């Protein structure tokens, strides 16, 4: 499988190996995998309260997993068929030219459980309860912003890039091509540029399973 990496500049080979290993574990467990790219930003005020980078992402994943488990339980109680979904993740910490931190993440789901993120826009009757909403809720709760009045204004701290999700199916004839397309997109997280290695905090992490 050839992977196009030229456009991202110097890449961290260890990050590449761990990204590929995490993706492989997902498709091995779930032959139909949905890969979702998101960006997480910090509020501009009280930014010093959010310096524990690895802990911050860990809390986000824990919150998201709890919401997914509750969502699946509601569906079971409603008599709907559900599929197991062990969420895997890959994250990197980066800095803008002005020094502001943000995080790029890849979230990997069982496509039989969540095939699409769903709309993340507010409709006239509010937000639809879908994967996007659970992700935005998880980040707001992680930052402890959910106690504020009108806390949904902070949902915009989660950014869903264009073409933010991809599907992989190991049984499709196009799997190798699709796999390379996904790797070409998410290997962006392995680029050396815009990361800081002098503050003794982690710039990269991924699921250990």
Language model features by range: what are they?
Residues 1-30, 112-209:
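Catalytic "initiation/cleavage/transfer" segments centered on a nucleophilic residue
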Residues 23-27, 77-80, 88-97:
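Catalytic micro-motifs at enzyme active sites that drive phosphoryl/nucleotidyl and oxygen chemistry
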Residues 37, 70-88, 146-165:
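Short glycine-rich, low-complexity/disordered patches
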Residues 37-43, 106-111:
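Short loop/turn segments at strand-loop or loop-helix junctions that form parts
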Residues 40-86:
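Short N-terminal edge-element motif at the start of the domain
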Residues 88-115:
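Histidine-centered divalent-metal-coordination microenvironment in nucleic-acid enzymes
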């Amino acid at each position: 499988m050839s992977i196009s990496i030229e456009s991202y500049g110097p890449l961290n080979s260890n990050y590449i190996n761990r990204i590929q290993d995490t993706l492989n574990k997902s498709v091995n467990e779930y032959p139909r995998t949905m890969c979702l790219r998101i960006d997480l930003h910090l509020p501009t005020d009280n930014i010093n309260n959010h310096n524990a980078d690895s802990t911050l992402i860990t809390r986000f994943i824990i919150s998201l997993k709890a919401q997914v488990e509750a969502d699946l339980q509601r569906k079971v109680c409603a008599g709907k068929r559900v599929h197991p979904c062990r969420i895997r993740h890959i994250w990197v910490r980066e800095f803008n030219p002005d020094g502001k931190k943000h995080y790029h993440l890849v979230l990997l789901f069982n496509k039989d459980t969540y095939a699409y993120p769903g709309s993340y826009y507010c409709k006239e009757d509010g937000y639809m309860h879908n994967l996007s909403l659970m992700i935005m809720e998880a980040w707001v709760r992680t930052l402890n912003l959910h106690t504020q009045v009108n806390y949904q204004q902070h949902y915009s701290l989660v950014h869903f890039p264009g073409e933010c999700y991809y599907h992989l199916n190991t049984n499709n004839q196009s799997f190798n091509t699709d796999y390379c397309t996904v790797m070409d997109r998410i290997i962006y997280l392995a680029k050396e540029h815009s990361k800081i290695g002098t503050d003794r905090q982690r710039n990269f992490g991924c699921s250990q399973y």
